[in-house]
Amino acid sequence: MAEFLFDRMGCAKCGFVGSLLIIVISSFFFNPSLSAHPITQDAGKPGVVLMCLSAHPDDEDGATIAYYTRIRHIKTYETFYTRGEGGQNVIGPELYRELGEIRSEETLAAAKILGGKAYFLGFLDFGYSKTAKETFRMWGGNDNVLQRIVYMIRALQPDVIITNHDTITTLPYRQHGNHQVVGITAYEAFTKAADPTYHPEQFGNGVGPWQVKKLYFRVLRKSELDQDSLVTIPVNMKYHGKTIQQIAWKALKQHRTQGMDKLNFSDLPEVFPQPVYKLILSDRKYPYNPNDLFSGIKPSVRPSGTLPEKYAVALKPFSIFVHPKYSLLKAEGTSHDEFHFKIDTYNHTGSPLYVAAFVNHGRQRVFDEHEELSRAIRDSIVLSVEVPSSSAAADSLVFTCVPLDAKKMPGLGRSTDVARLRRVTAGFDRKDYIGLVGTYDNTLEQTFDEFGVKYQLLDSAMLASGKLNKYTTIVLDIRGYLYRRDLVRYDKRILDYIRNGGNVVCFYNRPPEWNGHLYAPYPIEITEHRVTEETQPVTVLEPENQLFHYPNEILPVDWDGWVQERNIYLPSGDTTLTSSRYHRLLAMSDEDQHEPSTSLLWARYGRGTYIYTSLALYRQVKDLNNGGVKLLFNLISQPRH
């Protein structure tokens, strides 16, 4: 088994809409003088520069960055390939582009604490990827990725590049596919950035060939610590009364959407051991210093250059995101449908804004108002629109907000988002009365409200009372055993409910909050395994099970159109870890892999039934995928016994 020095490198980035598009980005290089922002170097003073390359927000080596900025006063750039928009959000319902906005804010807050300057390359975090091959394909090809990081190196002119990632592409030590691409392109860019024949169209305005002096990869496994010439960063040194580890800890806690704010001070030694680096490439032989990445590198004067706006500006001055992204078209036969929306606004101007907000349905404007937004970064506009009923299976509304004083603020302009209207042919048992143990995601609440499913949110008092028999099904939402400590406390009430004839549907949890406890009727051991290719075929192993028949017939077409991934955090297939009492109902795997058939488990317990699913069902239901909604309704419509 792979032995890692710290757990954070193994954190899973959840995915994005892989089946809807393949990101093929044409060459982004244009006249560097257009929309260019200056890169301020040290005003003619000799110096050295550090660059840290990371696939996603929170992948940066905060301790090393803080050491070199705070103790050594070295200019440091943090370059992120993505904004992490494909991940999970453990504090709210925001996903995809809006999650990327929030994670960018978190990253900038962390960089401010560390003392670095953050840049984003703009590649899409499309979800957890197992291979560099897939990541390169989704990011437009090897050269499209390489040329972009080469440009950043040429513009920012680092002497030393570090990364927590590497070039290993095979099991058992390979990282996330996005991480692999960072390592591979860092290695290749070391040479290409200095090659005057490689993409010479990048040159101009202070940007030209640049030779990096040293490239280091972080040592992540204890078995590699016995190598010669490793560099250990002395992060136990203090800056203004705090150790470098404490500064890095404070910065990491800014990544709230990834749950990092829950880190305890006692976790410090485990999360931030002394960073150890291995020299991968250098442009010449330098004297060795076991505590300094810059050993032997002489300070030099750098000319100030420019960066295109898309890389220099981490956050747009103004952006909007509409909720919900998908709304239900009502049954045919009505003349109009009414829809309710909330527009989340992100205002980074520091001033109140007056905006013209309007909504178009095709060529028809169905909403047009002026709204005042506060100076707060986040505000919202709540509105209702009425549109003629459509016979189409899908439709859309375009939301636009235009700041009325945009001319007074450079870079401030309109922002647009789209909401889709979909028709869904899924039924549920009208006798259903659902007890919902909610968490940070509101997808199930919105879905039940939209379809008219009768439900009640279960709070601590309701769980403690044990008076649960009035519910036909109790649903435990995603990561319930992390988010709801009362669920942990009163789990016996849930088991009693099943034993007395109830039906429980438990959505996925992660190993840290689940393993080592017996929350389910029979043992389930959760792993980090998943099926990330959402188009992979699904095999129904027990086609006679009523979960596939009542109240909806689950057909092969119902597995089409899924987004991001098939499943996540699969239970172990080993029957000594995940009991054989559970029926394995579905089989699916990524190409050339063999994942356990544990994405949908079903078992009888006493007079009731228990369902555990690691399917990424909430993403499908949020998008009103017809098959996803049908399966959800089947799970919750199983009768009490």
Give each language-model segment a name.
Residues 479-560:
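A glycine-rich, often tryptophan-bearing local segment used as a flexible ligand/cofactor-contacting loop or short
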Residues 309-428:
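Long beta-sheet-rich domains in secretory-pathway and surface-associated proteins
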Residues 309-335, 341, 349, 423-427, ...:
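Extracellular ligand-binding/catalytic regions of CAZymes and related secreted enzymes
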Residues 530-625, 640:
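Catalytic beta-strand/loop cores that center a nucleophilic Ser/Cys/Thr
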Residues 402-477, 508-510, 530-533, 619, ...:
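Aromatic-Pro/Gly-enriched surface loop or interdomain linker
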Residues 6, 34-51, 131-138, 142-308:
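Metal-dependent de-N-acetylase/amidase catalytic core
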Residues 34-156, 180, 184-191:
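Active-site rim/loop-helix segments in enzyme catalytic domains that contact anionic ligands
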Residues 15-31:
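Bacterial N-terminal signal peptides
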